[in-house]
């Protein structure tokens, strides 16, 4: 019995981080966990979780638009004229939010040669946000009462100077009030002409929600940005993009895989409605012309699959090589996702992880680049996953079953064997009134059956790891070796992965992000786990860690892991599994071994009689009650109406697990190779008989020879910015974790350390949603400030001609910072025709927006600044307005 180092106190130390793209240097004073956390006992505590902002918007058919746009390279005038035509078309269809592609005004440029025509054009064509082009589109946005977002190169004056040798790749956001906000691409891959931005931009679009702005590579390869947007309450992700131009037209299937895996995993994980607008057709640069595929989409996704509202066929295949405006085909609800407001979302930890990566990157000269240890004879390990469930509360029977699979794997030369999450004891949680362990011992089954690691079971199975020179990883519940852990007076344990080494060492990883009812019996771990092997480093996480929290996987990849191991217990289908876990393979260069429970889990009651009691726990502490589980278990659908696969016959939160495990490696990354980007090695959804089994993996072992060629993370100062990410997570922790003290301080030129400076979020319009009144929910301990409003604020509209505009005058309110007016065709405002925000008490609305209604209803609210924040009043009483047309 050998175990990795005992508990170590994490000493505090000061770290210097290179501020990438930021004007000020940063220092971080923090405790970075280096070793697994052990020796903890007593009361489990952590910072208070404060309420986070969430919004919901509902869009009718055709209110959202994206454009497959073909540029005339180097001709801004022609491109602007073409954009005007699309805007007019969108306005006629009733579009409220319209997105054009990246660099659509100029044509796409990728160059690091300052003498080239392309490089010079990118810089010379750049304009400020109040330049001629932005002013042109801002005026149209105001007239059409539409959000217009487009891509162009931008120049920004800093310290009274303009850089004449570089420019930004920016998204210009024009509001319905004629305001312009710009976002500068944070991770540009366009060459040295392009300066990196360093500030996320959140646009408060009023009734349409909160828009997070991201450009192309920012979206596909920077999950940290999307996480920040989601945590800050965004419900829509805007993605002007120029993707696919470097791919061979003969290999569009690989580009589509890249595009779909990246976007669908984001939408499903973070809850966004995504508007992605891509270039289409030829981009005729002088030296390197390329053809873009289009593929603009409007899409959201849930637990079981994507929903394409534009840009894809009925089977969710991306439609390519078609120019034109696309709008949402049906009404859609856009709501802020819940993952980044979950109690286990852990920005405090992420600050530490990314700060450590920033140090490492600085030490390596601004680069983090890795590859696996492969040779001509050994491309990687022979890996196996075990598709099974344990016997609920009966470790004796489960261990016997596990040994059979270990023996089989050993005889087949397996190097790494992975079992599912909590396989040793079973996953399902039962309420105390149903749990026989609770009734007999006063604790849940998961707590009673937990062991220390090393402990009885790990010591026993470690012998097999040594015998077969094999790594064995399996899920179990873990006690703290120092004593009992209490959470609000309830005894709890860790949800852990036991790690058995070929040399006899025993270690474990404790799950950091829990799922479902796991908080009833477990506490969160605190420390990542990296295994050193002859093939390279391997990171370990469990279920929700990998499915919902990319921060841990990104840490592993950037620390040099070329593989990660992922025991899980999920009912998510094959699409959910492949997009979530496949994204690490494709984006971060880590091969994946992910093993899911397969079969029934919980107390089996196939005969319909819940005949079990505390007396069904034998002298060994094993549960032996319930219906008898068949000695031979068949694959799903192998026997008609098999009661074993009926979830109604299982008690507990587990039920029936019938999804997939798989072993995934990098496929082809070459743009011309006709191969998939992710190779599932004949496992999971690519296993023989997958559809016949009802889209599940086969019971038992799935084995694959892993080829680690092409694995490994690659990040440069332009494409991976851990110092910035640490700063963003620090802001989130400061906002939403009670008692958290910022770990990041900016230094001014004098060397003093003032209050933390956070990249500012740009707001172009003040918040409201279609379904709820805006509330100050940033901190539940702060009372909402009320601004009163006069019910007679709305004056009569002017008499106008049918073809003209309607002017609405509002009585001025002393101290008002902004006014917002809404016009509706109905008194209950269920049919809102227009919403306008202004600092002035006068509003102008095109009659076309008012649907030529003769009778309208108008209401207003005002905002005052309270503690530097805009706080809105409630809506005034509505006023009926009759428009007399001349």
Predicted regions and their residues:
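Beta-strand-rich modules
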Residues: 850-868
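Sec-dependent signal peptide cleavage junction
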Residues: 28-43
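Cys-nucleophile CN-hydrolase/nitrilase-fold catalytic domain and related Cys-dependent amidase chemistry
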Residues: 76, 85-176, 244-265, 269-272, ...
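Ser/Thr/Gly/Pro-rich low-complexity, disordered linker/stalk segments of secreted
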Residues: 746-787
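Extracellular fibronectin type III
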Residues: 867-885
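Active-site catalytic loop in hydrolytic enzyme cores
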Residues: 126, 139, 155-265, 320-327, ...
């Amino acid at each position: 019995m050998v175990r990795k180092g005992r508990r170590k106190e994490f000493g505090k130390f000061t770290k210097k981080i290179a501020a990438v793209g930021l004007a000020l240097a940063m220092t971080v004073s923090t405790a970075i966990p280096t070793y697994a956390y052990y020796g903890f006992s007593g009361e489990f505590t952590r910072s208070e979780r404060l309420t986070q902002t969430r919004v919901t918007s509902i869009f009718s058919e055709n209110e959202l638009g994206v454009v497959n746009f073909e540029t005339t390279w180097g001709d801004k005038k022609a491109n602007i004229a073409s954009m005007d035509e699309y805007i007019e078309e969108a306005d006629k269809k009733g579009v409220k939010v319209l997105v054009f592609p990246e660099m659509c005004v100029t044509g796409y440029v990728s160059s690091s040669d300052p003498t080239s025509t392309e490089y010079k054009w990118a810089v010379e064509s750049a304009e400020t946000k109040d330049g001629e082009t932005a002013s042109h589109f801002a005026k149209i946005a105001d007239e059409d009462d539409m959000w217009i977002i487009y891509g162009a190169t931008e120049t920004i004056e800093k310290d009274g100077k303009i850089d004449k040798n570089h420019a930004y790749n920016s998204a210009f956001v024009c509001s319905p009030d004629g305001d312009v906000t710009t976002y500068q691409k944070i991770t540009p891959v366009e060459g040295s002409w392009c300066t990196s931005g360093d500030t996320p931009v959140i646009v408060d679009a009023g009734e349409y929600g909160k828009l997070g702005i991201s450009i192309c590579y920012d979206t596909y390869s920077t999950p940290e940005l999307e996480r920040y947007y989601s945590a800050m309450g965004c419900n829509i992700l805007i993605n002007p993009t120029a993707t696919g131009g470097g791919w061979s037209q003969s290999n569009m299937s690989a580009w589509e895989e890249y595009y779909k895996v990246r976007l669908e995993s984001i939408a499903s994980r973070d809850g966004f409605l995504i508007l992605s607008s891509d270039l289409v057709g030829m981009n005729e640069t002088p030296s390197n012309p390329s053809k873009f595929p289009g593929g603009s989409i409007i899409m959201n996704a849930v637990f079981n699959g994507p929903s394409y509202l534009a840009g894809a066929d009925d089977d969710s295949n991306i439609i390519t090589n078609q120019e034109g405006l696309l709008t949402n085909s049906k009404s859609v609800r856009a709501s802020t996702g819940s993952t980044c407001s979950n109690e286990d979302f852990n920005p405090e930890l992420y600050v530490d992880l990314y700060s450590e990566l920033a140090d490492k990157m600085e030490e390596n000269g601004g680069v983090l680049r890795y590859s696996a240890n492969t040779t001509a004879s050994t491309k990687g390990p022979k890996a196996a996953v075990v598709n099974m469930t344990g016997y609920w509360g009966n470790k004796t029977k489960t261990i016997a079953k596990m040994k059979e699979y270990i023996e089989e794997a050993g005889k087949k030369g397996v190097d790494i064997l992975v079992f599912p999450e909590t396989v040793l004891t079973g996953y399902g949680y039962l309420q105390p009134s149903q749990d026989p362990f609770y009734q007999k011992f006063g604790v849940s089954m998961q707590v009673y059956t937990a062991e220390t690691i090393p402990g009885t079971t790990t010591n026993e199975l470690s012998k097999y790891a040594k015998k077969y020179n094999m790594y064995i990883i399996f899920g179990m519940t873990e006690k703290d070796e120092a004593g009992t852990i209490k959470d609000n007076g309830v005894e709890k344990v860790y949800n852990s992965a036991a790690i058995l080494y070929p040399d006899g060492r025993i270690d474990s990883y404790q799950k950091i992000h829990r799922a479902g009812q796991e908080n009833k019996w477990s506490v969160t771990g605190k420390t990542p786990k990296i295994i050193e092997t002859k093939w390279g480093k391997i990171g370990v996480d469990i279920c929700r860690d990998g499915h919902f929290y990319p921060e841990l996987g990104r840490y592993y990849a950037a620390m040099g892991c070329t593989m990660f191991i992922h025991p899980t217990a999920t009912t998510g289908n094959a699409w959910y599994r492949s997009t979530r876990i496949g994204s690490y393979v494709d984006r971060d260069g880590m091969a994946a071994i992910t093993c899911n429970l397969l079969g029934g889990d919980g107390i089996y009651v196939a005969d319909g009689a819940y005949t079990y009691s505390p007396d069904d726990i034998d002298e060994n502490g094993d549960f032996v009650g319930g219906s008898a589980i068949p000695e031979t278990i068949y694959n799903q659908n192998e026997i008609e109406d098999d009661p074993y696969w009926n979830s109604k016959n299982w008690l507990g939160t587990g039920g029936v697990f019938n999804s997939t495990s798989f072993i995934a490696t990098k496929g082809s990354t070459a743009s011309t190779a006709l191969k998939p980007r992710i190779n599932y090695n004949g496992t999971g959804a690519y296993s023989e008989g997958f559809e016949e089994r009802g889209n599940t993996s086969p019971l038992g072992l799935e084995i694959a020879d892993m080829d680690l060629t092409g694995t490994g993370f690659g990040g440069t100062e332009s494409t991976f910015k851990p110092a910035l990410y640490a700063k963003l997570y620090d802001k989130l922790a400061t906002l939403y974790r009670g008692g958290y003290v910022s770990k990041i301080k900016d230094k001014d030129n004098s060397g003093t350390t003032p209050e933390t400076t956070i990249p500012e979020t740009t707001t172009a319009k003040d918040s409201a949603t279609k379904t709820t009144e805006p509330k100050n929910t940033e901190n539940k301990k702060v009372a909402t400030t009320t601004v009163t409003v006069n019910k007679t604020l709305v004056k009569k509209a002017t008499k106008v001609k049918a073809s003209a505009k309607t002017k609405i005058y509002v009585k001025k309110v002393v101290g008002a910072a902004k006014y917002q007016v809404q016009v509706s065709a109905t008194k209950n405002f269920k049919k809102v025709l227009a919403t306008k925000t202004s600092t002035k008490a006068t509003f102008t609305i095109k009659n076309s927006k008012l649907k030529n209604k003769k009778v309208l209803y108008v209401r207003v609210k005002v905002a005052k600044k309270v503690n530097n924040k805009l706080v809105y009043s409630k809506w005034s009483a509505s006023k009926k307005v009759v428009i007399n047309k001349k």
